Amino acid sequence: MRLYFSAFRHPKRLGLCLLITLSIILLGWQCVLLYNHSPEIQRSVYTLTGLAPSSKMAFVTMLTVRAANGENEVENTQQDWYYNSTRLLVHRLVKFKPTKSKYPVVVLAMKGIDQWKLDQLQEDGAIVKVVDPLYAHEVVDDVNDIALLDSRWSMMFTKLRVFEMYEYDRICFLDSDILPIKKMDKVFDVHQLSYSKDSVLFPPTLFYKPRRSIFWRRFTEEFAAYGLTRDDLYPYVFAAVSDPGMWHETPPPFKDYFNAGLFVFKPLKAHYKRLMALARFPKLYDNANMMEQSLLNFAYNSAGAFPWESLDWTFNGLWARKNDLPYLKAVHGKHWQPEGSLGYDEDTSKLWWDAFQEMQTYHDQQRNADLY
């Protein structure tokens, strides 16, 4: 009340108060007008996922059959570093107290992996689910449309099997070369997105340029072509971390392209059906230059009908350097590789080897305890 009467005693103050009030009213009116006439803004209104306490969530990784010389070969020695890194990821999420999760860890194991490896992963505390591989020639209409197809990439579409895990309400997929260094459970705190049902600009048009072409082309989704309706596909969840690039600042600036080594999503039959339909045409997604990563970046393009949500960069420390480590919850890369390897960093490599040694010591102690 004192300020109110003071304003009347000072005309300049009264004028300033009226100007501020009028500005707030005009700004609010403009925001409402912009929202009502902008499907893009309506589409980006998020609501926190209201999951019940009984909701099933899980961390999921994948172990693939080793490939060499164009033929699948099962690695029979302990020097299979993809297997070792998978064990380390499981250990960090299941046993190691500083990073232990309250959620289960599932390993999607490609058919053909040695049984002793599967048994060991189960003994380590993982749920092991054997899946058939998805070969590129089974997914795409014409493998000649794929930019680079060799033995290393031929089975990468198998990662899409994770979208078939409908028994879970929310999944965080992690590549097996991710090393948690802090608690990761908050990665599930993502949003659920719905599209405005009365939008006249739905679905939006995307533009793509096939390799070796100088022309951009238009792509507008027709859900009926998948045998789906809009209501089948919404609401949905898909969140990932912006790819920082090998040389980046700390923290790295946002780029509208995510790394598919870690993503959080809600498994839906409709979305799996849509992904498999899009996957048939590599020209849509950079000729599958990065295989399933290229596909997912197209399917969840921020300008499309299903924009991806950006997770905090600390959940996926790709190309990590010393300056990044204090902030990260996980580092991502083949850090067991020697100096001189692509992306090698001395501090991150030491971090990985220390973690690997801790896991070995833990298992040695467990075996010794079993003798008594």
Curated annotation (Swiss-Prot):
Keyword Flavoprotein part of the UniProt annotation: no
Annotated keywords: Cytoplasm, Endoplasmic reticulum, Golgi apparatus, Meiosis, Signal
One of the protein's GO biological processes: meiotic cell cycle
InterPro entries in the cross-refs: GNT1/Glycosyltrans_8, Nucleotide-diphossugar_trans
One CC-aspect GO term: endoplasmic reticulum
Compartments (UniProt record): Cytoplasm; Endoplasmic reticulum; Golgi apparatus
GO molecular function annotation: alpha-1,3-galactosyltransferase activity; glycosyltransferase activity
The keyword Ribonucleoprotein is annotated on this UniProt entry: no
Transmembrane region(s): none
Function: Has a role in meiosis.
Name the UniProt record assigns to this protein: Meiotically up-regulated gene 136 protein
Organism encoding this protein: Schizosaccharomyces pombe (strain 972 / ATCC 24843)
Organism lineage string: Eukaryota, Fungi, Dikarya, Ascomycota, Taphrinomycotina
